[in-house]
Amino acid sequence: MTAVLAGHASALLLTEEPDCSGPQTVVLFRREPLLLDCGRALSDVRVAFHTYGTPRADATLVLHALTGDSAVHEWWPDFLGAGRPLDPADDYVVCANVLGGCAGTTSAAELAATCSGPVPLSLRDMARVGRALLDSLGVRRVRVIGASMGGMLAYAWLLECPDLVEKAVIIGAPARHSPWAIGLNTAARSAIALAPGGEGLKVARQIAMLSYRSPESLSRTQAGQRVPGVPAVTSYLHYQGEKLAARFDEQTYCALTWAMDAFQPSSADLKAVRAPVLVVGISSDLLYPAAEVRACAAELPHADYWELGSIHGHDAFLMDPQDLPERVGAFLRS
């Protein structure tokens, strides 16, 4: 179903039952344009989203990771469902594909085509689009939860929408990218620029996958050979690259990683946050080391820090959550 809203503050409520087989779609910013941080104005922004539970004025907003989408039921089953932290019987759960994404929302490629070149997007731009969606759904208060890029986007929500965000959960994400993280993204974008059309994106994914795991994790899961003469880790990385290139857009990859790299809130910005926040670090995370995540949490006046102990690196929040769902559920209910 697609609904067209005249303006970003419309109170139109989409009342169809949530369809877990595909997202709902709404068009926002028809009457008043969305003003981007780069100075451009966008009209007719399409947003793809999923909802779970009965619509109401307070909700939990899930923010997806870099290559994710709005189908939380597909990629976060440890968190969504009966008796889990995001229980549709007790909560109204919303997740939208971000601005610039390639899973139903107006994409980076579409923006480039209509604006005669790439359009720089910011995480704050994405938060403003998300807020417009919540306005259209009649949501007035929200609990925000995100991991990886979604965690960085949660920081943007805390800064951009302080009147709307009741509390936030930030998993495996810093408030700002370090030179290490920017360097990894720079290498990925360089690969895409040198080999557009999919081959560069495959290499970008291989670079990213190494930062998402840990040496011990790969030693346990990708040792030896599955094909004679080919190391298992080589087969694994090739498979991951092929899989992403088949479903993801390289312009989206560049736009979203650039937005993450450019998001650099000051310590004063973070100290102004008044909402309670649960920040989760991952003990073996190479991309966002736990010490870095913990240091960002210390800049928030009302943050609790908890660390997930796992050998599986950054992706442990998906691969090896252990007690994480229980910790998150307790915080959201408190």
Swiss-Prot record:
Q: Where in the cell is it found?
A: Cytoplasm
The superkingdom of the source organism is Bacteria
UniProt: substrate binding residues: R205, D315
Cited Pfam families:
Abhydrolase_1
Q: Which reaction does it catalyse?
A: L-homoserine + acetyl-CoA = O-acetyl-L-homoserine + CoA
Chief localization: cytoplasm
Question: Which leading EC class covers this enzyme?
Answer: transferase
Keyword Acyltransferase part of the UniProt annotation: yes
Pathway annotation: Amino-acid biosynthesis; L-methionine biosynthesis via de novo pathway; O-acetyl-L-homoserine from L-homoserine: step 1/1
Q: Which GO terms describe its molecular function?
A: homoserine O-acetyltransferase activity
UniProt name for this protein? Homoserine O-acetyltransferase
